[in-house]
């Protein structure tokens, strides 16, 4: 069996799931839910050899959208190798990692599509999960063994990636991402200057009549100061009449 995961050859056999083969070969495929198909961290895109895999399981039909299925999407922990041949797949973590280093702008549309697919399959996914819980398919020794195997596979992937160098790590360093973003030709956005319009002056019209003066003062109106009369000193001189 010729299985190629993320452009790397992985040893595998008929009857084995791609997820199990990926764990045993420390391939860059997500390991979270222990093979129950819940997290979709092991989502893969089959690039070649889809006819060598078994048909979609009920779990895949519940959690994968029609768009993902049409694009060759499978869940690695559910996709079983049915016959000999060449199968080439690309995992979601590796696909995202390549986008970060090649064309980060693709991540916007990629994330939007994945979010739409997830929202579209919430109801059938939950129904499938409830059915498996009722049938007792979510526990037992097999589930514990799958979980332990997933942890061991993830640890082996990290150790192997560190030995190969930083570029092989599943998640790029934040320093690398920051350096990449700083080199992107992002356009400078200049905000336009906004000038507020001048408000027109408002003049109240003159009343055609004058209000009568009240004989008393209102308590809420300020008292007008009364003008004080100024006294002027006047000298009167009386002269007696002249004699004839």
From Swiss-Prot:
GO molecular function: 2 iron, 2 sulfur cluster binding; metal ion binding
Keywords: 2Fe-2S, Chlorosome, Electron transport, Iron, Iron-sulfur, Metal-binding, Photosynthesis, Transport
Cofactor (UniProt): [2Fe-2S] cluster
List of residues binding [2Fe-2S] cluster: 33, 39, 42, 77
Location relative to the cell: Chlorosome
Location of the 2Fe-2S ferredoxin-type domain: 1-95
Lineage: superkingdom: Bacteria
Annotated coiled-coil segments of the chain: none
Pfam families for the chain: Fer2
Example of a GO cellular component annotation carried by this entry: chlorosome
Cofactor note: Binds 1 [2Fe-2S] cluster per subunit.
PROSITE patterns: 2FE2S_FER_2
Biological process terms in GO annotation: photosynthesis
Function: Could play a direct role in the oxidation or reduction of the quenching species formed in the chlorosome.
Protein name: Chlorosome protein I
Species, as recorded: Chlorobaculum tepidum (strain ATCC 49652 / DSM 12025 / NBRC 103806 / TLS)
